[in-house]
Amino acid sequence: MLNILMTHLINPLAYIVPVLLAVAFLTLIERKVLGYMQLRKGPNVVGPYGLLQPIADGVKLFIKEPVRPSTSSPFLFLAAPVLALTLAMTLWAPMPMPHPVTDLNLGILFILALSSLAVYSILGSGWALNSKYALIGALRAVAQTISYEVSLGLILLSVIIFSGGYTLQTFNITQESIWLLIPAWPLAAMWYISTLAETNRAPFDLTEGESELVSGFNVEYAGGPFALFFLAEYANILLMNTLSAVLFLGASHIPSVPELTTINLMTKAALLSIMFLWVRASYPRFRYDQLMHLVWKNFLPLTLAFVLWHTALPIALAGLPPQL
């Protein structure tokens, strides 16, 4: 009985609660970073140095009355944000930090499949609101997400050929001699840009173009449901950066100090997340056709070429992983 309780309740909770806390403070870091980049302080009133701001934001959002447009679809209106957050939390299950909640043989495929399902929550919310702005925003988001998933999938395939397995733990073993960032740096660059687009972040945040779309597919959401979307979006950002750290920034343990494994991975993921914020502060939004041109005309041919190249390399080098 205790075993079942541990596996099905305590373990998932011990995973979900820290992720949600990290998401809350990622919003604070974002506001602080953007503030300092614009030569201002950012949140500094609630608590010391504004540290309690995320808690105040969360309380404020969840005690607001959830207003629902009278013409919207009641079930879909609530189901979409719940689905978004559920998927965002489930995606963390196979992440090796250093031990995953569910040790899957095909962890990478699981992440790829579930991140594709997130499209349905966006589409559902855009359609349920019965508003033309929300629908256009949702269609943009869906087109963008599924386009960039093509390049993400091909990049993953190339990297999997290097590591020789679909489990995320094998990447730690592969990269004990050298980070995959070094032999596969063009893939790492394309992967990072694709994760920016996949998570709808600036400069790819076309779904939230205030000037033309009044904030996109979550335009009519307020209070609790909006907070769920918000949490899901930032959880996905953290997940993508943790995944980037596992895939390209290698073995999360230093052989001499194995105790630092988790801190090591967290530091890499946090630095990558701060780069997300840096990009947001630096670049203006793309035009929609440029966004699509980038993935279909630039990334797709390049990633296909790299898949061929990475297939040829292990055959030529007797299946050895990259080494110094």
Curated annotation (Swiss-Prot):
GO process annotations (BP): aerobic respiration
Membrane topology: Multi-pass membrane protein
Enzyme class: translocase
UniProt record similarity statement: Belongs to the complex I subunit 1 family.
Cellular component terms (Gene Ontology): mitochondrial inner membrane
Protein name: NADH-ubiquinone oxidoreductase chain 1
Keywords annotated in UniProt: Electron transport, Membrane, Mitochondrion, Mitochondrion inner membrane, NAD, Respiratory chain, Translocase, Transmembrane, Transmembrane helix, Transport, Ubiquinone
Domain of life: Eukaryota
Gene: MT-ND1
Pfam families: NADHdh
Location in the cell: Mitochondrion inner membrane
InterPro entries linked to this entry: NADH_UbQ_OxRdtase_su1/FPO (IPR001694), NADH_UbQ_OxRdtase_su1_CS (IPR018086)
Function text: Core subunit of the mitochondrial membrane respiratory chain NADH dehydrogenase (Complex I) that is believed to belong to the minimal assembly required for catalysis. Complex I functions in the transfer of electrons from NADH to the respiratory chain. The immediate electron acceptor for the enzyme is believed to be ubiquinone.
Organism this protein belongs to: Cyprinus carpio
A single MF term (Gene Ontology): NADH dehydrogenase (ubiquinone) activity
